[in-house]
From Swiss-Prot:
A biological-process GO annotation: regulation of DNA-templated transcription
Highest rank taxon of the organism: Bacteria
Locations listed in the record: Cytoplasm
Protein name, per record: Probable transcriptional regulatory protein Ccel_0181
High-level lineage: Bacteria, Bacillati, Bacillota, Clostridia, Eubacteriales
Keyword DNA-binding part of the UniProt annotation: yes
GO cellular component: cytosol
Primary location class: cytoplasm
Length: 248
């Protein structure tokens, strides 16, 4: 267990923005729409849709909502035409930030992002300015409980093709190559495991610690503001938060 990603330390805990379930489901519905448009409405033949559905389930999206989103995407009745686009920038203290967005208006999205980066002491950069500081990996997180045996889970994950396995006080973390993510996730799902997280993510190769109280405050507000934007699906960053900062 190398622990190279330290997911629990670098991924912001689901905060006030993600507490609004309707907002999460709206964002996931957009991801479903794009997946259906790219590969059809049948998850058995559309691996992207299958992965999005797994992400929906990890976020406790009811199956009825998932199926309605797929049907709506198949019909394209509302005329919306969403696309996926990634923006990059720097937060306070040079923290690298990546925002994965699903939008029907690039200008609106870029304007909203720029506003918050500027407001909280960062700046929106050019494409590629920070992405080289991250590795794209599949991430599966399983809660620790009496039903899960750590050694068994580790062996089953590695046998299915996982690259790495780690754990902390609360959960187990499984890292995969993006190409192997679906295979590993499906193998563990078939064995009855339930996931807290199950998605392809961006993991920083190095992290940045902030010591200035104002920078810490602004960085926290920046992430919260970005996550709260309807167009933003995922926010990744290189900020290594102390436990006391995560709890605030």
């Amino acid at each position: 267990m190398s622990g190279h990603s330290k997911w629990a330390n670098i991924k912001r805990q689901k905060g006030a923005a993600d507490a609004v379930r309707g907002k999460i489901f709206t964002k996931l519905g957009r991801e479903i729409q794009i997946a259906v448009r790219m590969g059809g409405a049948d998850p058995s033949s559309n691996s992207k849709l299958k992965d999005v559905i797994a992400k929906c389930k990890a976020n406790n999206m009811p199956n009825d909502n998932i199926q309605r989103s797929i049907k709506r995407a198949s019909g394209e009745t509302d005329g919306s035409n969403y696309e996926e686009i990634t923006y990059e920038g720097y937060g306070p203290g040079g923290v690298a930030v990546i925002c994965e967005c699903t939008t029907d208006n690039r200008n609106r999205t870029a304007g909203d992002l720029r506003h918050y980066f500027d407001k909280f002491g960062g700046n929106l950069g050019q494409s590629g300015c920070v992405s080289y500081m991250f590795n794209k990996k599949g991430v599966i997180v399983i809660e620790k409980n009496d039903k899960v045996n750590e050694e068994t889970l580790m062996m089953e994950a590695l046998d299915a093709g996982a690259e790495d396995f780690d754990s902390d006080d609360n959960c187990y973390e499984i890292i995969t190559d993006p190409a192997d993510f679906s295979t590993v996730r499906e193998a563990l799902e078939a064995k009855g495991y339930e996931f807290i997280e199950a998605e392809v993510s961006m993991i920083p190769t190095t992290t940045t610690k902030l010591t200035d109280p104002e920078q810490i405050k602004f960085m926290d507000k920046l992430i919260e503001a970005l996550e709260d934007l309807d167009d933003v699906s995922n926010v990744y960053h290189s900020w290594e938060q102390d436990e006391e900062n995560e709890e605030e």
